[in-house]
Every structure is written in C-alpha cells, then in structure tokens.
Amino acid sequence: AASTLLGLSALPTDHPQNVGMLGMHGNYGPNIKNQECDLLVAVGMRFDDRVTGNPAHFGANAKVIHLEIDPAEIGKIIPADVAVVGDVKRSLPLITERIRKRDHSQWIAGFRACDQIEYEAVIRKAVHPAEGRIRMGEAVAAVARAYRNDAVLVTDVGQQQMNAARYFGFRRTRSVVTSGGLGTMGFGLPAAIGAKLGAPDRE
C-alpha cells in the first residue's frame, strides 16, 4: 500500500506491504509502479495535483475503485470505475472480504528494487551524507530514531514538511498532524499544542 501525505501513518513504516508515499515529493517506487498497476484502490483520497501531477497520466492503465466519505470527491479529478461512498471503516471490509488471496511477492519485489535505486540516488545523500553540514533529512531521521518511530509528528509547511514526510518513521496510526490542502504556514506550533492536549501520553 502506498500513502499520501495525509495518510502517512496508516501503516507502520516497516510494514512489509508499505511501499512509501505517492506524489511529487513521494518515493520512486509508488510513482513508477502507479503507471504499471491494473487496479488502483483509493481509500479516502482526494487525488490532488501534488499526488497526481497530470491527471491524464495518473494510473493510466488502471481501473479505479474509489472509497470516500465525501461524494463530491468521487470522480472530481480521476474518474472512478467503482465508487463507494461512505465511512471506510465500514465499507472497506465489505470489499476485502470478497478478495481472493493471491501471491503478490513479485509485485512487492518490484517496489523493493525501486527502493534500492532511490536509496542510492537520493536517500543515502539526504540521510547519511559523507561530509558537509547536517542535512534536513538527516536531522529528521535522527529524531525519528531517537523516539523509536513512536512520536506524533507535527509539521509546519514548506521544505521541512516534505523532508519530515519522507524521512520520519511511524509505528502507530494517527501519528501525523500536518496541513495538507491549503498548506497553512504557521500551522505547526498550535497544532503541536493541540496534539499534546489530545494525546498527552505520547511524545
């Protein structure tokens, strides 16, 4: 499963079927394999331009099943072959219980090959630079490790938001508070206060 910015902690970062973040600031694998997939199941997804780029080329070979609570989002950007309007907590199990299990190990292996390409080309320099100043990605990854990928991530908007999205790890759901959509600058501090009040037992 790939995620978008607002769904980052839906699966733990190290889950074997978590293939990274989709979109212009996302990972190589989801963006490449999106062009190869024959079925795209979009759960609570708006298909905004930061994810799709040119909608005409997004998942061009795929049938689309779109699950969304807001009917206005269905077919707004990407046409849905199957539209499911409602709370995904109820509607998603109705779909998954009808799916026949198959071996997708080769498909997942394709993502892992992309991971290796991206690591060598981009991530190694961002997170483990050989020399020079501390990089933003390096700092984000160090903080994530210090909190054992178990902290609630709150970001403001800008380059640090994207670095945090790429290099912060998650073990639990509901671990990201960030401003998508309008991307409101100045969001970080009041959101962090709210996150601590809402989850006082978490860092």
What residues fall within each predicted segment?
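Short, well-ordered coil loops that connect the C-terminus of an alpha-helix to the N-terminus
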Residues: A60, A80, K101, N149, ...
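Active-site diphosphate/adenylate-binding microenvironment
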Residues: G7, D115-A199
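Glycine-rich, acidic loop regions that bind phosphate or pyrophosphate groups
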Residues: L8-R112
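Generic beta-strand/beta-sheet core signal
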Residues: A2-L5, A42-G44, L67-E68, V154-G158, ...
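Conserved catalytic cysteine-centered active-site region
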Residues: A2-P16, G169, D201
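Residue-level signal for threonine
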Residues: A2-T4, N27, R135
